[in-house]
């Protein structure tokens, strides 16, 4: 039986967006995907492209008319479209600003005018900037350390203003180092987990930025899907018009990540256990440590992450081994 609720997922051909599309289609929602395929991939959509409840709009959030077309008849927006990556933003701050701020504002305006019920958007842990306090608590942020971090913080400011001024319900999800199936291992700005997995599978030595003691709150994709669903469906009025950390709530050093990857990949190829890693300089704009408090999400949204970092990593490794070999 088809669900009559219609969801727009911007950036729906990307890593997180395509996983959201697949999940909500499995729940019989009507799903519209808006993507310009600058970083997303059509192969991420193959599994459900013929689903009668799925509609693809090839467009760009930098064009207001594309946004207006995409939100027609939509109940909820899950806004994932953005140019990610701190290094990319340092190399090209103008395009990052155009997509992440101007594009975001276009989506807010289009959603407001179409009377969308709720606008859930991908915020970022980079907003915490130079704040050294751990764990990260939503109301206590530092100064941004990169153009990317600035754009994601401005998103939060715009969302807050649209909530207060126009009555548009918004919820921001500060993603912490999301990983899992469909995450692209290729390209100059590939995330660390798929990049390391691919290098190990090719029997290459991964290059670790710094001494490997930097730590991250790595978050499996299914926890992110869970948070998007909770944000979309909550009827708790205290839970809307705010931001939430979206993570597991534990941190893992890069050295430990390497250890786990070698252990899990060795189940498929024992020789991977003997591959050494190379250590290089720290990366500009990177924060040393990231650990998230998920207390607020638990209290207001009922969030209890289904996957630990290690259980999620095992699932991700299985997927990569099956799909990248």
Per-segment meaning from a language model:
Residues 1-178, 228, 289, 305, ...:
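N-terminal Rossmann-like NAD(P)+-binding domain of SDR-like oxidoreductases, especially those catalyzing
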Residues 61, 141, 180, 213, ...:
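Residues that form or immediately flank small-molecule/cofactor binding pockets and catalytic motifs
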Residues 154, 158, 162, 192, ...:
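Hydrophobic alpha-helix immediately C-terminal to the catalytic Tyr-X-X-X-Lys motif of short-chain
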């Amino acid at each position: 039986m088809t669900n009559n609720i219609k969801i727009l997922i911007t950036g729906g051909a990307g890593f997180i967006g395509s996983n959201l599309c697949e999940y909500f289609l499995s729940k019989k929602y009507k799903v519209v995907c808006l993507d310009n395929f600058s970083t997303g991939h059509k192969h991420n959509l193959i599994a459900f492209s013929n689903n009668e409840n799925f509609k693809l709009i090839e467009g760009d959030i930098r064009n207001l008319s594309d946004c207006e077309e995409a939100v027609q008849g939509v109940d909820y927006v899950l806004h994932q479209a953005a140019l990610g990556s701190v290094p990319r933003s340092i190399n090209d701050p103008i395009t990052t600003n155009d997509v992440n701020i101007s594009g975001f504002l276009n989506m807010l305006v289009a959603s407001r005018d179409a009377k969308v019920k709720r606008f859930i958007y991908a915020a970022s842990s980079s907003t915490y900037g130079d704040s050294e306090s751990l764990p990260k608590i939503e109301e206590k942020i530092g100064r941004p350390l990169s153009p990317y971090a600035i754009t994601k913080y401005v998103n939060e400011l715009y969302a807050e203003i649209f909530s207060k001024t126009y009555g548009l319900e918004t919820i921001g999800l500060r993603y912490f180092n999301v990983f899992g199936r469909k995450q692209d291992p290729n390209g100059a700005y590939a995330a660390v987990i798929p990049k390391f997995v691919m290098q190990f599978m090719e029997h290459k030595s991964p290059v670790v930025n710094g001494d490997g003691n930097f730590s991250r709150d790595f978050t499996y994709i299914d926890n992110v899907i869970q948070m998007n669903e909770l944000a979309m469906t909550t009827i708790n009025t205290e839970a809307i018009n705010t931001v939430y950390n979206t993570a597991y709530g534990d941190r893992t050093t890069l050295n430990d990540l390497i250890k786990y990857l070698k252990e899990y990949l060795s189940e498929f190829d024992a020789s991977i256990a003997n591959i050494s890693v190379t250590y290089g300089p720290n990366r500009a704009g990177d924060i040393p440590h990231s650990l998230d408090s998920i207390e607020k999400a638990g209290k207001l949204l009922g969030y209890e992450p289904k996957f630990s970092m290690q259980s999620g990593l095992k699932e991700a490794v299985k997927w990569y081994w099956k799909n990248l070999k």
